[in-house]
A protein has these predicted regions:
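Catalytic domains that recognize anionic headgroups
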Residues: 3, 9-546, 550-553, 559, ...
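Conserved structural position within tetratricopeptide repeats
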Residues: 496-499, 529-532, 563-566, 596-600, ...
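Eukaryotic tandem repeat interaction scaffolds
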Residues: 572-607, 613-614
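Ankyrin-repeat and related helical/solenoid repeat scaffolds used for protein-protein interactions
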Residues: 604-653
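Terminal, low-structured helical/coil segments at or just beyond the last alpha-helical repeat
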Residues: 641-672
């Protein structure tokens, strides 16, 4: 087998915005690529390092000795020293990596955003050219079904992300993420069963992501800097994969691209983690690409590149035509030995601009979005108070030159606007409806759940995130407190957030946490306040309906639940609550219909057979009632309630002995 191995987390500038020409004809071959018709395309293995800073990599100059495996791989690869991510969040950045398009084109601008079927997608393209395709994910955040990252499984024969479905308890490694070595083990198991022929594997490692909880011995070894422990552990996982590729004879023939999707602020500029700001701590990412047989191995490229360049690079390397819709540029021209040696500072690549953005602050907090352009020696950030930094003299971006160098800022601002205009597709995506369980899992990962309410307003309007970043940090800390079962502290902190920055999302989160404490009387007004601010939040309607059910306000719960199922017909849990609410309010025909709906999704639902049996009995359908109550008994033989309700039906039928028998059975089961 042959393959390409990629570790993601970097971005490339847009050539068309700079008015440049392509570095290499899109369908030309690299020197490493065989051109005979009998040649076998190399295998492709994509490994993305989530939340991994460039300055932690030994091959990029770090002295922390965290990445021996990656450093060894880098010696046989082309290393890009200035690679930049387009978005400091996992789904948008991975969408850029895999589509070769900018966020304003693929429209995956946050969590929950679907990847459109008409956007070019590397797995689907390669599958069409005979590649077998598989993905192995380290976090629920890339689960390919609503409401996480819908559409990301397009083109994959295998998309291994369902580990969280089997999770129990509160352990995050059973519910929202899994260790890197486990991800690698699944990938290797797939390789063991894989038949001959080209393949594409994507391996996603999440171990550097907060709350920075690496396994031993990394937990103890890096106790003072646990983020570094996650980096060291993910490097260990990469090493296991590389070792097995070599043992199986796959390493030499493979293309291996290693990158992070984004970095981590670690307190820089006041941001604890990532998602909001666009400084180097979260946007400058590691990127290396090993060509088959280590062609050009050891070469270092200092030209500015972007993650959007990865997809066309991979396609060109394996001889697959690059779709015209792809906006990145193939990097093979920079990697080819003769071209780089002949003109190492070619104007074509010397200063391509790099674009990045984050709409996360707008979508989730109601603040302004941020956009940036790295061009020549400058970092320009488009914000309510724009920013300009001289990267050569101020690499930490501490001295804003936007006022003193207004002409430069004006020029870069115009270039940024032009780039956005040239790379948008004119469409507007909407987030998938977020169910409460999914909302809690995103919270455990430190992310807000976007209701979509702020999509109605201009993303470039609102407070400057620089003035509000502590709010984002407080929310993140509250999420971690909630996950670690410190309920009262997390609720108190969230109430402080609401006092300073009231949004529908925060009120919904507060209502959810209060419900978890069974404090329904406080949860109800919080959820009603959320709906005042965002009447279209279906998840909040569901939470309010559920809360009202728990307080036995069935009449109040019904309209809330009805709003959800009208928009999301397959919201099975809402149908389950509705069947009970209708039954308790004597709307029996509607209760029967809801039971039948639920059973259409799950023919083993005990509660639906129970309510259906009782409701049919109350409408005079004794035969149907007994039939469904018996099905309930078959599912749960030790449950007393179906026997008690069967007794009522037998009474209606005048079968007193049968009624007495069922009541006796119900009484016996109640005492067991």
């Amino acid at each position: 087998m042959t393959g390409i191995l990629i570790l993601t987390g970097m971005t490339s500038p847009l050539a068309t915005a700079a008015g440049t020409m392509r570095a290499l004809p899109r369908n030309s071959k690299s020197p490493a690529q065989k051109t005979t018709s009998k040649s076998v395309p190399p295998p492709i293995i994509l490994i993305t390092l989530d939340t991994t800073r460039a300055d932690r990599m030994g091959f990029l100059g770090s002295q922390r000795d965290l990445t021996p495996s990656l450093d060894g791989l880098a010696k046989q690869s082309v290393v890009f020293t200035r690679a930049y991510s387009q978005y400091p969040l996992t789904p948008p950045s991975h969408a850029t990596i895999l589509t070769g398009t900018y966020p304003q084109f693929h429209q995956v601008n946050d969590m929950q955003m679907p990847l459109a079927a008409d956007v070019p997608y590397v797995p689907e393209i390669l599958h069409g050219f005979g590649y077998q395709t598989a993905a192995f994910l380290g976090s629920i955040v890339l689960e390919p079904h609503p409401p996480y990252a819908p559409g990301f499984n397009r083109g994959f024969d295998t998309y291994d992300s369902g580990f969280h479905d089997d999770g129990v308890g509160e352990d995050r490694f059973q519910t929202v993420q899994r260790r890197g070595t486990e991800v690698v083990a699944h990938a290797l198991a797939w390789l063991s069963k894989h038949p001959k022929g080209p393949f594409f594997i994507w391996v996603h490692l999440y171990d550097a992501h907060d709350p920075y909880d690496p396994p031993e011995p990394y937990k103890t070894r890096y106790a003072s800097v646990p983020y570094d422990g996650g980096i060291a552990y993910e490097d260990h996982a990469v090493g296991k994969l590389i070792t097995q590729l070599k043992l199986r004879g796959l390493y030499d023939s493979s293309v291996i691209a290693v990158m992070a999707d984004h970095g981590e602020s670690l307190g820089a500029h006041g941001e604890d983690t990532h998602g909001v700001f666009l400084y180097d701590e979260t946007i400058h990412v590691p990127l290396l690409i090993k060509l088959p047989h280590a062609t050009a191995g050891g070469r270092r490229v200092d030209a500015r590149v972007e993650l959007v360049d990865v997809a066309p690079t991979l396609l060109q390397e394996v001889g697959v035509p690059i779709p015209a819709e792809m906006q990145g540029e193939s990097l093979l021209g920079l990697m080819q030995a003769e071209m780089a040696e002949a003109n190492p500072a070619a104007p074509l690549w010397h200063d391509r601009p790099a674009y990045s953005q984050s709409e996360y602050p707008h979508n989730n907090f109601g603040w302004s979005a941020l956009r940036s352009l790295r061009s020549e020696k400058y970092l320009y950030i488009q914000a309510p108070r724009r920013e300009l930094y001289d990267d050569a003299t101020d690499p930490l971006a501490e001295h804003n030159l936007a006022s003193s160098s207004a002409a430069v800022a004006d020029t870069l601002g115009s270039q940024l606007d032009s780039l956005r205009h040239q790379t948008t597709n004119g469409k507007k995506a909407t987030p998938a409806v977020l169910d409460p369980a999914a909302q809690e899992k995103l919270g455990a990962l430190g992310y807000m759940a976007w209701t979509g309410n702020n999509a109605k307003t201009d993303a470039d309007q609102g407070p400057d995130p620089k003035d509000k970043i502590e709010i984002a940090n407080m929310v993140h800390r509250a999420d971690l407190l909630q996950e670690n079962m410190h309920a009262s502290e997390s609720i108190a902190l969230l109430e402080q957030v609401i006092a300073r920055n009231p949004t529908s999302s925060f009120y919904t989160k507060l209502g959810t946490w209060l419900m978890r404490q069974q404090d329904y009387q406080k949860a109800i007004p919080a959820l009603r306040k959320a709906l005042e601010m965002d009447p279209d939040s279906m998840g909040t309607h569901f939470l309010l309906g559920k809360c009202l059910m728990f307080t036995q306000d069935y009449g109040g719960a019904i309209p809330e639940l009805e709003k959800l199922v009208a928009k999301v017909p397959n919201a099975v849990e809402a149908h389950s609550f509705l069947e009970l609410a209708y039954a308790r309010t004597n709307r029996l025909r509607e209760a029967i219909g809801e039971c039948e709906t639920v059973l259409g999704y799950d023919a083993t639902d005990f509660g639906s057979y129970l309510i259906l049996g009782q409701s049919l009995g109350r409408t005079g359908d004794s035969k149907g009632a007994l039939e469904n109550l018996k099905k309930a008994i078959a599912l749960q033989p030790q449950a007393p309630l179906p026997h008690a309700w069967m007794a009522d039906v037998y009474d209606q039928m005048g079968l007193s002995k049968d009624a007495e028998r069922e009541r006796a059975t119900a009484k016996r089961l109640e005492t067991q």
